Amino acid sequence: MKRRILVRGVLVLILLLALYPLTKFVILPLFDTSGELEGHDVPLYGYSEPDTSMVMENDALRFELDPATTHFTLTDKRTGHVWLSSPDNADSDPIALPVEKNKLNSTLSLTYAASTGMTTQFTSQEHSISNGVYEVLMQEDGSVRVNYSVGRVQRSFLMPTAIGDARMQQFMEKMTSKQKKDIKEYYREYNIDKLRKTDDKAALLAAYPDLAEEHVWVLRDGTKDHLKQRCESIFAEVGYTAEDLAYDNSRIVQAGSTIAKAVFNVSMVFRLDGSDLVVEVPLDDLAYDVDYPLTSLTLLPAFGAGGTADNGFLFVPDGSGAIIRFNNGRVSQRAYYANLYGWDWASIRTQVTNETRINFPVFGVSGDSGSFICILEDGASWAGIGADIAGRLTSYNTVNATYTIVHGDAYDVSERTNNAVYMFETAHPTGFIRQRYRFLPESGYMDMAASYRDYLTAKYPDFAAQTVDADAPLSIELIGAIDKVQQVAGVPTSVPIAMTTYAEAKDLLRELVTRNLAQNMSIRYAGWMNGGMNQQLLSSVRLIRQLGTQEELFSFAQNAAIAGVPLYLDGLTAFARDSGLLEGFIAFRDAARFTTREEAEIPEYSPIWYGANDDRDTYYLVKPAIAMRSVNALVDAAASYGAGVSFRDIGYMLSADYDSKNHTTREAVLHQQAEKLAELKASGRDVMIRQGNDYAAVQATLITDMDFDGGQYSIIDEYVPFYPLALHSRVSYTGASLNLADDAEEVLLRSAEVGAGLQYTLTAQSARVLQDSTYSEFYGADASLVLDDITAQVAQYRQTLSGIFNQEMTGHERVGNVTITTYANGTRVYVNFGYTDAAVDGITVPARSYAAQQEVSK
C-alpha cells in the first residue's frame, strides 16, 4: 500500500467542499487536436546533376562533393589527409548486407513511424540518390546545400507516359531516324480498331479517352530506368518541356503519381569555417506527411570510417571520455549507444534496466594521419551517440549522432485490450541541427581533448578567464531531513526526520574547521526545507520545524561565512514530490505532459524487477515555467542567508514538456537553464551542480558527482580524462561521495587520475535513524564514525597532489596498470590501479595508490 498523508487529504477535501458552490465543471476532451497538422503530399525535389563537383576551399581545408552520389571528400591541407563521407569500397564489403551497404554509402539516414509504433529506416543512397529525387546547390554564401527527397518513390522523367498520335508526330518530325526507331521500340502505338486479343478495350478507353478519336502512344510496361533516360534525352533534344508533360498527363485518367505518402524532404548544408566543417540541417525546411512522423535523423553515419586494415580509435563521450580501438574484436558485445543528458523525463517508460547518459556532446575518430572531433552545437539535447566496430555488421568502424525529431509514446486505449496507439508530437522542432567537425593533424586523444577545451574557451570568454584554487577542492554534503511513515494520532503519516539539524550543521562545520579541512572546502546542505530530501514543490521555501529555527539556520550560514567556507543551499526545481493543493501544486495545471497528453506522473522503479514499484509514491515532472519559478524561489532563499545555490537537477536532468497547448522542447529547456545559470554567474552568485552537462559546467562554481566511469560498456577499451582536461583549472569538480560509494578506493584512484577533488556526505545522527526508511544509501554518512578516516584521506590527497588544481592538464598516458597525468607546471601524477607495486619514471607507486613527481619539467 502506498504511503498516504491522510491528514493532508482530509484538509484538501474540506477545502474542495467549501469551494464546491463556486465551481463549474466541464468535460474536456482527452486529446486536443487544435495543433494537429493537416496531412499533405510532399513535393519531390527534381533530379539535378551538375557537370562539375561542388568545391569549397580555404587555407586549411578543401571540400569536394560529387553531385552524382553526394559523397564528398574533405582534405586537410596541413597534412594532406583525405577524410571520406563514405568508404570507397563499401559496395564490395564482404560481410555487409545490402541494407548495411546502403547505410555506408549514405550521408543521411532516417526513421519514421506508423501509428502502431513500428519504425522503418530509409537511407539517402537507396531512397533518394538512386531515384534521382534530390538536388545539389551552391549557395550565394559559398556553402553547398543538398536537398533530399527520401522515400520509396520512382524517379520522374521528363517524357510522356502516354501521348496522342498528333502530338507524337510533331516531336518525331524533329528526331533522327535512329531516335525514331528507339521511340517506336520503347512505346506501343495503340489503335482502337486493331487491338490484341489480350487487350482490355474498356480499360484502355477509360485510361486514355483520346484513344476513341486517335491513336495513342503508351510507354511499355517494365521499361528500365536507363531506357527511360534515353527517351528523356531524345525528347529533351526535340524541345519537350515540363508544360508538355503536364498537358499529356492531363489527357490520362488516373495517370498515377510517383509521390508516395512516406516521403521526407530533408536538407543538409555544408560550410567551411577555418579548420572546421560545419554541417547543418534546417529543421524549418523539413517536410513529411503527418501520418508518417519523422522520428529520427542520423547525419554522416560513416564519415571518417576506419577499415579492417586501419589503425586508430573511435572516441565516445562516455563517463570522462572513452576510446574504442578499431577492430578490437568485441563483436559479441553490444554496440555503443548513449543519450545526451540522460533520459527525457517527459517520455514514458515502463521499466528501467539501464539508463544511459553522457554529459558533453563530442565524438571523434583518430587515425594514423590525424583526427577529428565532432561537436554537436545545436540540437544536442535530442541526440544520442552511437559507435560500432568492424566485424559485426560491416567491415568498418563508425561513430555518429542520431537525433530524435518527433517524440512519441504508447497510449493504452483500454484495459480490455493489449493494443496500444502511439501518439506523437504534433510538429517537429524548429531551428537547426548543427554539427561542427574540427580536424587536427595530431592523433592523440589528449590533443582532441585540448581542441575541445579551446572550443569552450573561445565560445565562453568568462569560462576562459576563470581560475580555481591550487589545492584540492573538498565538497561536504550535509543531509538535513529525510521522511518516514510514523503514527500521528494513530494515523500513518509521512513526517520529516532530522538527520542534521541547523544547529548540528554549525557544529559539524566547527569540527571540520578544527580538523584543518576548511581550505578550499564547500558545504552543500540538502534536505533543509520543504519536507526534506523528498522535497515538495518549491513554490516557496518553508523551513522544517524538526530541523530548528530560522535563527539557527542564519547562525550556521554566518559561521560558514566567517570561516571562509562557501555554503550552498540545495534544492530540486523540476519535480513535485509529495505535493498537493496545500503546497500550491495542481497536477492538471502544473504537471508537464507526455506526448499522450497525460500528466507526467513518474513512479519509483524497483532495482529488483526494474518495473514501477507500487509501494512507493509517484511524483510529477512540472512544466518548465513552474520549474523556473522554483529556481527563482531557491535562489532568493539562498541569497537571504548569504549562501550560494545548489541545484539537484539543473545541469544534470533535462526534460521537455509535450503539452500540445503549450509545447516546450528539450532544446528550449536547455537554453532556459543555460541563460539562468549565466545570469547567476554574472551576478556573482556561486552555483553548484551535479554531474555537469556541458552547457551548465561552464557556468558553475563547483561540479559534484561527476561520472568518470560511464556505462562500462564492454565494447569500450579504455576510459580517458577527455572532459576533465577541458574543464581542469577553470572549474572545480569532484566524483561521487567516497564514504557512500560501492568501491571508495576506485573512486579515489579515478579522482587522482582525472584531477578531481573529493566529496563526502555526512549526517549528525546515527545510521540507526535510517531504519524503516527508503534512504539506505546514507548508512555510511554518520559523521561520528567516518570523520577520522576522512581527515586522514583528505590530508594525504592534498599533500600528494598539491599545486595541480589550478593548472591545465596537458597529457595523459597509460603504462601497464599505471596512468600518468601531466600538468602545465610539469607535475606528473601516477595512479597505480594494479594490485602490486609498480616502478615508473624512477619512482615506485604502491599498489592501489597514487604518487606525484613535482615539476620535473616546465
Feature map (PLM): residue ranges:
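Carbohydrate-recognition beta-sandwich/jelly-roll modules
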Residues: 25-34, 55-499, 509-515, 520
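Conserved beta-strand positions
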Residues: 299, 523-525, 569, 646-649, ...
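N-terminal Sec-pathway targeting helices
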Residues: 1-15
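Ser/Thr/Pro/Gly-rich low-complexity linker/stalk segments immediately outside membranes or between
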Residues: 26-48
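Active-site-proximal substrate-binding groove within the catalytic cores of carbohydrate-active enzymes
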Residues: 58, 65-77, 365-399, 576, ...
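Hydrophobic alpha-helical membrane-insertion segments, chiefly the h-region
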Residues: 16-26
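Solvent-exposed loop/turn segments at secondary-structure junctions
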Residues: 71, 152-154, 287, 527-531, ...
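Aromatic-lined carbohydrate-binding/catalytic grooves of carbohydrate-active enzymes
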Residues: 470-626, 656
